[in-house]
Amino acid sequence: MESVNKCGKSASTRNCTVKMSRKMWVLSLLALAALQLHSGSEVAAHLNVFLNPVEVMRLLGVSAEVYYVREGHINNYALNFIVPVPANVKDISFTWQSLAGRGLPYSINVVSSDQEVLPRPAINVSHSGEIPTTIQTWSIALKCSGLKAAEVDVTVSLEVVLNRSLNNVTHLVFRRKKICLMNDSAEDLSEDVDDPQLLETVMLPPTGLITLVVGVSVAMGSVCLLLMIAYCVKGAANKRQHHQHGGQPMRTSSFQRLNTHPPCQSSMGSAAYMTPSIIAPIHGSSLPRKVPVSVEQQHPEELHRRISELTVERCRVRLSSLLQEGTFGRVYRGTYNDTQDVLVKTVAQHASQMQVLLLLQEGMLLYGASHPGILSVLGVSIEDHTTPFVLYPALNNTRNLKQFLLDPACARTVTTIQIVMMASQLSMALDHLHSHGVVHKDIATRNCVIDDQLRVKLSDSSLSRDLFPSDYNCLGDSENRPVKWMSLEALQHKQFSEASDSWAFGVLMWELCTSAKQPYAEVDPFEMEHYLKDGYRLAQPFNCPDELFTIMAYCWALLPAERPTFAQLQSCLSEFYSQITRYV
């Protein structure tokens, strides 16, 4: 394989960046909802401007009220966010209310950055008038011309006069990014709400809605910002509970789902639940996908050819120490030609022919992969009356990533920045594999390695079933599978694709944040399909920033087409890395 350049910013990658950012935004609001912060600008408590639960569900996939201005407190964090509008959403809405005891004069201006693609956005209220003292929702029609596919920036400017004699005027700017498709005519019917589960969620009674109270200023210093996020994440995590069939909450739960019933407590004290499966997709992405290949598709002739090319003499391999041992599998540290440090995978003498064949087949999965983030096989030794050796390069004390994370002395020294760096390295490696039509099918920390410089590499899954037996389960079909890492379509129909790899990568990121805890530890493997269909997903780890959790949660969208590609994941991880290192 040749290295692939992933630095280009395609339109679909930008789609992902803004789409991922919207979920980062909403989840960070959920984490901060319990705090009554007053560090933002104020407008004398005369005004509310917010998105109602229906609008938030349509655009952001969460049942909540998101305030831009609440009782005069301006949420600059929300105002600075550009909300993407999917192609199937034909209008956007806002809700406002005057709290001054009288109508507040206003003026509205809506601007499209491309009149050819998105002409004349029309609002259903006057461009100038008075904000009523009762709650009112108004909307802006965003009907694309269908002449070409593009992303169009829509800027909504709202000017509110609080006190004309004192020249007290508030200016608010709301930004949207509308996705327009070719032949997407203005007459197309809207598909805003067509999911029964989404409909059920949107039509919750008011007592079951989450009200977000946020007044965070983006201009806060780095120390305050980091401390605030850490405090809020810890507080939210301590309150996170799982309600099963109306029973008592399980405080040790590692998963969560959307709460579709009114909570017993107020929204400020109840757990915040999330179902990524109902996130509306961005329909502007059209990345071509190659036909995937996997271990099962390797022909015997191809396997023989690869082994022939990689054959090394057994006498050149020296084993120095045993790193891992299973029922039949072994992993050693050693040297090749007395100069090159290597990892050696092999099997015991009592291993069956099938186990030997599986070692060779899975060991060849990443054959020829030339990428700094991939641990490709270096050589194979097969000699009569001996078990095979599969060699991998192992500079700088390379070891298994899951074992590294399970070692308390190592795991507690890993920072959030380093976790993001690891995830970014692996996303680039997987983007490289997918660009060559290779689907990994078993992405997890057990199938990665790490060196002393915390550089991580993706490896194949050979011997993993034997070395990490608790990570695999047999569901009555005589096949050990990584059930807790698998997407719903992989569980139900054994359908593996780039999208199922994306799902597993989300679980891998969760492992990185939890020191390789077992995902869905409380769930019986036979119940996983049921739990995923019901919307349950892994809960946010205690030490995981909201933005990072949003990236992993987006990988768990129910429909494969709604999950991000690894090029998109890399873009989002790079953006988050820039954010968290800006003040360091």
UniProtKB/Swiss-Prot annotation:
Name recorded for this polypeptide: Tyrosine-protein kinase Dnt
Positions bound to ATP: L323, Q324, E325, G326, T327, F328, G329, R330, V331, K345
Entry-linked Gene3D superfamilies: Phosphorylase Kinase, domain 1, Transferase(Phosphotransferase) domain 1, Wnt, WIF domain
GO MF annotation terms: ATP binding; kinase activity; protein heterodimerization activity
Transmembrane regions listed in the UniProt entry: 209-229
BP terms from Gene Ontology: axon guidance; axonogenesis; cell surface receptor protein tyrosine kinase signaling pathway; determination of muscle attachment site; muscle attachment; positive regulation of neuron projection development; positive regulation of phosphatidylinositol 3-kinase/protein kinase B signal transduction; salivary gland morphogenesis
Phylogenetic classification of the source organism: Eukaryota, Metazoa, Ecdysozoa, Arthropoda, Hexapoda
Keywords, in A-Z order: ATP-binding, Cell membrane, Developmental protein, Glycoprotein, Kinase, Membrane, Nucleotide-binding, Phosphoprotein, Receptor, Signal, Transferase, Transmembrane, Transmembrane helix, Tyrosine-protein kinase
SUPFAM superfamilies the UniProt entry points to: Protein kinase-like (PK-like) (SSF56112)
UniProt xrefs under InterPro entries: Kinase-like_dom_sf (IPR011009), Prot_kinase_dom (IPR000719), RTK (IPR050122), Ser-Thr/Tyr_kinase_cat_dom (IPR001245), Tyr_kinase_AS (IPR008266), WIF (IPR003306), WIF_sf (IPR038677)
Regions of compositional bias (Polar residues) in chain numbering: 250-261
Residue intervals on the Extracellular side: 41-208
Family: Belongs to the protein kinase superfamily. Tyr protein kinase family.
Tissue specificity comment: Expressed in dynamic domains in the embryonic epidermis, many of which border on sites of epithelial invagination into the embryo interior, including ventral furrow, cephalic furrow, fore- and hindgut, optic lobe and tracheal pits. Later in embryogenesis, expression is seen in imaginal tissues.
GO cellular component: plasma membrane; receptor complex
Record domain Protein kinase: where: 317-577
Active site: D442
Chain residue ranges for the region called Disordered: 241-261
